[in-house]
Amino acid sequence: MPIKMKELPETERPYEKLEQYGAKTLTNAELLAIIIKTGTKEETAVGLAQQILKLNTAKENNLKFLMDLTVEEFMKIKGIGKVKAIQLKAVSELATRINVVENYKEK
C-alpha cells in the first residue's frame, strides 16, 4: 500500500509546499495533484499525476500535450474518473485561453 499524503512530511505535500514556498517550486506532477485533489487507495494524487504525465507521447519536456487529451483519454488512468478528467480538461482550456490573451498582447 502506498504512503498516504498525510503521512508525508509537510515539506513534501503539494498544498503545503505551494503555500510555504510558492507555486514555482512545485513539480508538474505536484501541480496536477493539486488540481485532481485526491488519489485512490492504491495511488496518491501525485502518483496519479505522474501517470498523466506519462501520457506525453512526444516525450518533449512540456505540458502542451495536456491540451490535446480528451476527457476519455484522462479517464483511461485508473483513479481518474469523469469529475477529475473534466477538472483537468477545464484547466487545460483555461491555459489555452490565457495563452491566447498573452499572444494577443504581444502583437
Q: Where does each model-flagged region fall?
A:
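Alpha-helix termini
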Residues: 40, 92-94, 106
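Alpha-helix boundary/capping detector
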Residues: 44, 92, 100-101
